[in-house]
Curated annotation (Swiss-Prot):
Keyword DNA-binding included in the entry's annotation: no
Gene that encodes it: murD
KW Aminoacyl-tRNA synthetase (keyword) present: no
Pathway in which the depicted protein is active: Cell wall biogenesis; peptidoglycan biosynthesis
Organism lineage: Bacteria, Bacillati, Bacillota, Bacillota incertae sedis, Caldicellulosiruptorales
GO MF terms, alphabetically ordered: ATP binding; UDP-N-acetylmuramoylalanine-D-glutamate ligase activity
Record protein name field: UDP-N-acetylmuramoylalanine--D-glutamate ligase
Length: 457
């Protein structure tokens, strides 16, 4: 793919878009940037954009402008239904994302690509940690750490890439072919963008559409939707399950012990209770990580060592502090009901929950039922607070309170908590109504908890 002298339009000037622009510029393209946000809404990105881009358009771009470009790179946050992208498709101009662009210039074909509604970051990090014990050149990137495009020019044919990939990024691939494509689970999420579960599932399935007979598809047998994909998967299939399951290549649990069967050989790995990070969802993440590393010939002892010591990742049921016997956990990455339910189920102690945020169109019916069983009190904030409250009231749960800020939620949670209680931030919603992203929300939560430690807030 020769970029020199090409007019390339980058749509969406966030992290992924600017990373693509840097790469395009370095390879001799004339780079035009467009973002629907008004110019004054840009903060630190504005200076980067002005340095990188030959032309910039904010808010809107003239229709006739599309005739000037030979390639469009779209950021994952931009729906393909946006007018410039629809026009480009109609005119036969190629529209791809940053993942596809990076793949076309990537020297290595040792790519592990991991997607799923929940567990992506933890599993991606785990896979990276396991592989790094046996291989020198392992790069973990994508939605975690650096964008894929920022890592390829310092890589070689021997580099192993471990990518966290979202459904939005998978919408814009074309030739992207990982050695291993993994779908951890599929539950309702991003329905404001995908509209239906069928569309969402089809987007996730794209991770294995180009895998050949030398590659592997990893699927979760315990999730209804991914189980139904086993017969449709490309390449060699590796299945993981929390129960004993009969497949040629499988990672499973029997009598509380983890085993794998791969290429005709069955091995015991470890007792499931020896995994350091808590919760059934993290057991699934561990089984998936084992599945993704088997084709690389990883030793069983290496897997065991990592799973016994890996302490999890930031914003995923992250222990923050203990104050007067009250433990605070940051699960800001709980951006949908399924993730928040898994966080609630990870604890046996009484829970005081902080929930609510940006409305992605999910139902809170099932979530409310679990809250009623597991949670002493809920502090609700953000766009969805009334929606969640209505579901709680419908089933007769009245121990909730509206708050205006996260700081207020932390203070009031501490005031009503008792020795042995858990204060859990697991919003079951995205963060965009009050914060830039879930990372900022999680960091602010930790900051407020640490203020309690020092000042009593």
């Amino acid at each position: 793919m020769d970029l020199k002298g090409k007019n390339v339009l980058v749509v969406g000037l966030g992290r992924s878009g600017l990373a693509s622009a840097r790469f395009l510029k370095k390879h001799g393209a004339f780079v035009i940037g467009f973002d629907e946000k008004a110019e004054e809404q840009f903060k630190e990105e504005k200076n980067d954009a002005q340095k990188l881009l030959d032309e910039i358009y904010y808010c809107e771009i003239p229709d006739e402008f599309i005739d000037r470009v030979q390639l469009v790179i779209v950021s994952p946050g931009v729906p393909l239904s946006k007018r410039p992208l629809v026009l480009a498709h109609k005119k036969g101009i190629e529209v791809i994302g940053e993942i596809e662009l990076a793949y076309r210039f990537c020297k290595s074909k040792n790519i592990v690509a991991i997607t799923g509604t929940n567990g992506k970051t933890t599993t991606t990090t785990l896979v990276g940690e396991i592989l790094k014990k046996q291989y020198e050149d392992v790069v973990v990137c994508g939605n975690i750490g650096l964008p894929f495009i920022d890592t390829i020019e310092t890589s070689s044919e021997d580099t192993i890439f471990v990518l966290e990939i979202s459904s939005f990024q998978l919408e814009t691939i074309k030739y992207f072919k990982p050695k291993i494509g993994c779908i951890l689970n599929i539950t309702p999420d991003h329905l404001n963008r995908h509209l239906t579960m069928e569309n969402y599932t089809k987007a996730k399935m794209r991770i294995f559409e180009n895998i050949d007979e030398m590659g592997y598809t990893v699927l979760n047998y315990d999730n209804n939707i991914t189980r139904d994909l086993i017969g449709l998967a490309k390449g060699n299939v590796i299945v993981f399950s929390k129960t004993k399951t009969q497949f040629e290549n499988v990672v499973f649990v029997e009598n509380d012990v983890i085993y794998f069967t791969f290429e005709g050989k069955t091995q015991e790995v470890m007792k499931k209770d020896e995994i350091f990070i808590p919760g059934q969802h993290n057991l699934e993440n561990a089984l998936a990580a084992i599945s993704c590393t088997l084709p690389f010939g990883i030793e069983k002892d290496t897997i065991e060592q990592v799973l016994k010591t890996f302490r999890g990742v930031e914003h995923r049921i992250e222990f923050v502090a203990e104050i007067n016997g009250i433990k605070f956990y940051n699960d800001s990455k709980g951006t949908n009901t399924d993730a928040a339910e898994k966080a609630l189920n990870a604890f046996e102690n009484p829970i005081i929950l902080i929930a609510g945020g940006y409305d992605k169109g999910e139902s809170f019916e099932k979530f409310a039922s679990l809250v009623a069983k597991k949670v002493k009190k809920v502090f609700l904030l953000g766009q969805t607070k009334q929606k969640i409250a209505s579901e709680l009231e419908r089933i007769g749960y009245k121990n909730f309170e509206f708050v205006s800020t996260l700081k207020e939620a932390v203070r009031k949670s501490f005031e009503c908590a008792q020795n042995g209680d858990i204060v859990l931030l697991s919003p079951a919603c995205a963060s965009w109504d009050m914060f830039e992203n879930y990372e900022q929300r999680g960091r602010m939560f930790k900051e407020y908890v640490n203020e309690l430690l020092t000042t009593g807030m």
